[in-house]
Amino acid sequence: NKQHVGTFGDLGTFSFFPGKNLGAYGDAGGIITNNKKYAEKCLRLRNHGSINKYDHTMIGKNSRLDTIQSAILDIKLKDYKKEVLKKRNQLAQIYLEKLKNIKGLYLFQKKSYAVNSYHQFVVRTLKRDQLKKYLDDKKIQTMIHYPYMLSDLKIFKNQKGHKNLTNAKELGNKILSLPISQDHTKKEILYIVKNIKNFFSVNKK
């Protein structure tokens, strides 16, 4: 609804990890806010608690984004909407059109009121592991990006409030990320579609 991601709260955070749609060449990230108080605090926290040299008013750390990474992101950002976002949406549309009528394969439909960045293109199927192996054998790399829920991690496992996450667990065992990036071609996506269709044609039960 024409409101940018990251602007729904007091602060928004973005990862610029190299594998992201808008990625630097090393670890990087950013925070946005229109609150001057929070902005100043973030500036201090990222620089050992100081904005002006030797004026340390709180405990902070070195979280400054170096100039090289900033320059890389600045160049990439200029082409992000025109090149990256547009290309990923075009390729995602091929998936959505070509895979929509396959029995046993479920797609996450895009919403009319939102623009999707398609950092990942995720499908859902009971035959997730078999499909992944089939595509791997065809030299098509797929990913299970998040094989564990947060509640399964040791740090959270014994905390209260997440004993019966049956829907999340069920979904987590069915989802698979298909290849998608601005560097993929239409021909490559159609090849992936062809192999997915082949898999389901011989694995109907």
Each PLM stretch: what is its role?
Residues 1-23, 52-57:
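Conserved active-site segment immediately N-terminal to the catalytic lysine
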Residues 6-7, 24, 31, 170:
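Solvent-exposed polar/charged
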Residues 12, 24-28, 71-73:
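Adenylate-forming
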Residues 14-15, 29-34:
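Short beta-strand-to-turn element immediately C-terminal to the catalytic PLP-Schiff-base lysine
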Residues 21-22, 30, 65:
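A residue-level structural signature of the nucleotidyltransferase/glycosyltransferase Rossmann-like core
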Residues 34-205:
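PLP-dependent aminotransferase class I/II
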